């Protein structure tokens, strides 16, 4: 079975200096190499560890962005449980989520501030982290890289709720990457391939296959 750490390290050896993610910022596309992405993941993971969030449930409540990808990989691989939720959720849904799964922290986008403020009034002990503070932390030797069990829950996603109440689904790294090596053999990728992220990252396909695979 494979883990996020193994995938990041193996891919960094091959694609470390290659462009990995392009994000449109103020009308222009800014590129990040795979090596820069891995460094940002390690840097943010070490910051979350210092904040005492190891083993905790951390929600990501924001639209698609490079910072979202960094946060998701950092939490799942080295910190705790990434709880990915739709940026369209209401304040009432956030409050219900916080109560049901005992949320410990939330990374939120700028457009979600009003909803997050409503949550903050009810749950002062939750740690609130603006998503713009995620990337850019230098990786340090203080990162402990064996705190997360690949067979335990690393990610919680929710069904769409179109036919009823959204249902939480718990995934381990072993679940998520069970087919990773087979896919690499069947559809080998190189730096000339282009993958367009067309779904929100809280979707299972976008957040796993479209991004991490």
Where are these regions (language model features)?
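Conserved AMP-binding A3 loop
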Residues: 31-34, 154-180
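Conserved ATP-dependent adenylate/AMP-binding module captured primarily in the ANL superfamily
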Residues: 87-116, 179-196
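Conserved AMP-binding/adenylate-forming core of the ANL superfamily
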Residues: 20-52, 56-65, 69, 73, ...
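Conserved structural elements of the adenylate-forming
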Residues: 38-43, 169-190, 195-198, 208
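ANL superfamily adenylate-forming
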Residues: 111-150
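A short N-terminal helical cap/helix-turn-helix that marks the beginning
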Residues: 1-20
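Conserved pre-ATP/AMP-binding loop-to-beta segment of ANL
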Residues: 16-19, 140-158, 165, 188-194
């Amino acid at each position: 079975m494979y883990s996020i750490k193994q995938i990041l390290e193996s891919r960094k050896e091959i694609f470390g200096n290659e462009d990995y993610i392009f994000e449109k910022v103020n009308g222009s596309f800014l590129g990040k190499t795979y090596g820069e992405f891995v460094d940002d993941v390690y840097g943010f993971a070490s910051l979350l560890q210092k904040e005492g969030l190891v083993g905790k449930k951390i929600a990501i409540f924001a639209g698609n962005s490079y910072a979202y990808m960094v946060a998701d990989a950092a939490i799942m691989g080295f910190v705790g449980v990434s709880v990915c939720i739709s940026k369209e959720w209401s304040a009432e849904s956030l409050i219900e989520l916080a109560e049901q799964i005992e949320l410990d922290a939330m990374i939120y986008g700028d457009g979600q501030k009003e909803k997050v403020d409503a949550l903050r009034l009810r749950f002062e002990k939750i740690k609130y982290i603006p998503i713009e503070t995620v990337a850019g932390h230098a990786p340090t030797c203080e990162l402990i890289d064996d705190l997360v069990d690949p067979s335990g829950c690393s990610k919680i996603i929710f069904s769409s709720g179109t036919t009823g109440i959204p249902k939480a689904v718990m995934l381990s790294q072993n679940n998520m990457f069970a087919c990773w090596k087979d896919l690499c053999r069947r559809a080998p990728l190189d730096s000339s391939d282009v993958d367009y992220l067309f779904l929100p990252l809280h979707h299972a396909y976008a957040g796993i296959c479209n991004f991490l695979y």
